[in-house]
């Protein structure tokens, strides 16, 4: 983001600080998207409603507790290790809406006193704990029912996937003040970020992707 000297001098707000905050949020979401796209390519898929493909999902094929019982069973059968005693589901806010009215649902505050919670955790079904994220994958293309978005809920065990750790390649926010670089008249400041990030599925049987529709499928776009 480039900021002019006139903007910096005349604006009431500190635009360098604001740009840094906005780019920090964008950087986090971008890096999360890289991980999401990598892990969403797994081969173990359960389609809601007993369907056999994404294209054949219908309006009634929303998330239901039985789907997570099936996912947990598959993970246990594969000897997938648990994370703090449970498997973890990464769920979109739109599809978590479909589960919250289930009688089996346990809100996070009912067990948080005895169990450390994950950031974004919203509740639990059986031995599956749910972490809500807007980065959970959504498709809306020719592979989906016409005009409908399909949502991914990823259920994972320990060591199902990994992300990169490169020395010196972590997220860096870089602020250049007026007069930096090719700016002889001190007219431009810049704020930006850079990072190295990739993700890889390590053990396919240690993750299960559940695909479903939602009450919001007609209104939501892909991410």
Segments from the language model and where they lie:
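Glycine-rich, often proline-containing surface loops adjacent to acidic residues and nearby aromatics
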Residues: 1-5
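Alpha-helical scaffold segments that mediate packing/assembly in large oligomeric complexes
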Residues: 6-78, 94, 217, 221-222
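Short loop/turn segments at secondary-structure transitions that flank enzyme active sites
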Residues: 7, 29, 93-97, 136-138, ...
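Sequence/fold signature of self-assembling virion shell proteins
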Residues: 55-72, 100-223
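Aromatic- and glycine-enriched pocket-lining scaffold segments that form the walls
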Residues: 80-96, 100-102
